[in-house]
Amino acid sequence: QKFVDDPGAIVIGAAPMASCFGPAYETAMILDTDLRKRKIRDRVPMTYVTSEPYIGHLGLGGVGDSKSMLESEFRNNDIKWITNAKTTKVEAGKLFVTQVDDLGNTYKEHEVPFKLSMMLPAFKGIEPVAAVPELCNPRGFVMIDEFQRSKKFKNIFAAGVCVAIPPVEVTPVATGAPKTGYMIE
């Protein structure tokens, strides 16, 4: 209610190494819809900041026509975006972003103002599991073989979000792959 009474800029997005981009897109669209219903969207500039190389990459190299579909929705709803973005610092009301080109070289520095922000973090595994030597990758996720068994300890199996899934492709700013492929089902 406080924001509605005194609206301002919104920044939504995903930090480098994030691997679950859907909730950030969903948040942007839900906020856009809600602010329009309240008739204050015209007073709320929105910027989507992401490590993805393009809108709709989703950590998967795109899904069908996700790039043009999401870009079109963002344009139609006046949501600006910054891709290939490395969040370098956050201060009260400001997100500092380095945007890189396709080779990873600095292209542009941004200071993005906000009154409300939601950035998806890069996930990490839990310390007790991550601390086991040779069990996990540097982010703390269990490295497994095709049978979902630890590559180092053949009596340890892993399923779900604790599994280390390699990126689908190399991107200028690190993006992870969503972990939906290794659920227990």
Predicted segments with their positions:
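A Rossmann-like FAD-binding core segment of flavoenzymes
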Residues: 33-143
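Conserved active-site and cofactor/substrate-binding residues in soluble primary-metabolism enzymes
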Residues: 22, 26, 65, 82, ...
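Cofactor-binding loop segments of dinucleotide-utilizing enzymes, especially the Rossmann-like FAD-
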Residues: 15, 51-53, 161
